């Protein structure tokens, strides 16, 4: 009986990795552990009410910034963290990976984004924190709960993995620029949520932590899947 053919490993230039997803098993464990530990600390602060001390001070300072150019920049930034933008970026990347016969990469993008959306929904339901309604400005207040920030969580879990797959075969300088841009986008998305007053700063920090935690878990599973493929082909 013939054994089914395994999906061939990607041929060509050896990939030179810069950051996430190529961090290996130990790196994935460390990233996930640190991020999830920080999320727990942040969640405890929110539940105990201790986060209010810095939430109010930061929001007061941020809300002093109020001008048309800044508003336009923040509006663009906050759109990058929406479900539509995140889903589109992940979907197009997955399709591109499939067309290149990079099934593991495509699956990783889908799982990372879909899992992040599910985690966001679950966490909001668990904590049920009310949004800072009296501080919202120039934007429609979402009906969902406040903690954690979904825009921040989805951005942290999706953009690094999307950028990684798009530039992983490029030179190290190109990868460095791409991941730096991803980092700036993630930070801008989080800041925009505080700027518009639809989230407390602690919501954004919690979203970042949960997102990076899930990113670490995704990176770990991706590395394990590729290692299994290599072992099967070596038999």
Question: Where does each model-flagged region fall?
Answer:
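N-terminal transmembrane-helix/juxtamembrane module of multi-pass inner/ER membrane proteins
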Residues: 1-85, 125-142
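Short hydrophobic alpha-helical membrane-entry/anchor segments
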Residues: 36-48, 97-103, 121-127, 191-199, ...
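Hydrophobic alpha-helical transmembrane segments
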Residues: 78-101
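Alpha-helical transmembrane spans of integral membrane proteins, capturing the lipid-embedded, hydrophobic core
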Residues: 29-33, 109, 113-117, 208, ...
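Membrane-embedded catalytic cores of phosphoryl/pyrophosphoryl-handling enzymes
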Residues: 134-235
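Small-polar-interrupted transmembrane alpha-helices in polytopic inner-membrane proteins
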Residues: 110-129, 178-192
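Hydrophobic, membrane-inserted alpha-helices
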Residues: 69-72, 88-94, 160, 186-190
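Interfacial segments of alpha-helical transmembrane regions
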Residues: 24-26, 95-118
């Amino acid at each position: 009986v013939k054994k089914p053919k395994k999906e061939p490993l990607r041929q060509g230039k050896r990939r030179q990795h810069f950051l996430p997803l190529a961090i290996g098993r130990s790196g994935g464990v460390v990233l996930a552990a640190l991020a999830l530990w920080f999320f727990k600390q942040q969640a405890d602060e929110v539940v105990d009410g201790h986060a209010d001390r810095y939430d109010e001070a930061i929001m007061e300072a941020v809300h002093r910034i109020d001008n048309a150019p800044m508003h336009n920049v923040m509006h663009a930034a906050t759109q990058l963290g929406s479900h539509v933008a995140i889903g589109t970026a992940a979907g197009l990347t997955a399709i591109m990976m499939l067309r290149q016969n990079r099934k593991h990469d495509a699956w990783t993008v889908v799982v990372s984004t879909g899992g992040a959306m599910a985690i966001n929904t679950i966490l909001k339901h668990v904590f049920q924190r009310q949004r800072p309604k009296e501080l919202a400005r120039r934007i429609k207040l979402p009906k969902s709960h406040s903690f954690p920030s979904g825009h921040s969580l989805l951005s942290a879990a999706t953009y690094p993995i999307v950028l990684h797959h798009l530039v992983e075969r490029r030179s190290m300088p190109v990868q460095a620029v791409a991941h730096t841009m991803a980092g700036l986008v993630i930070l801008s998305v989080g800041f925009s949520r505080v700027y518009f007053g639809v989230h407390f700063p602690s919501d954004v920090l919690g979203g970042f932590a949960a997102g990076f935690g899930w990113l670490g878990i995704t990176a770990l599973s991706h590395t394990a899947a590729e290692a299994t493929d290599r072992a099967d082909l070596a038999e």
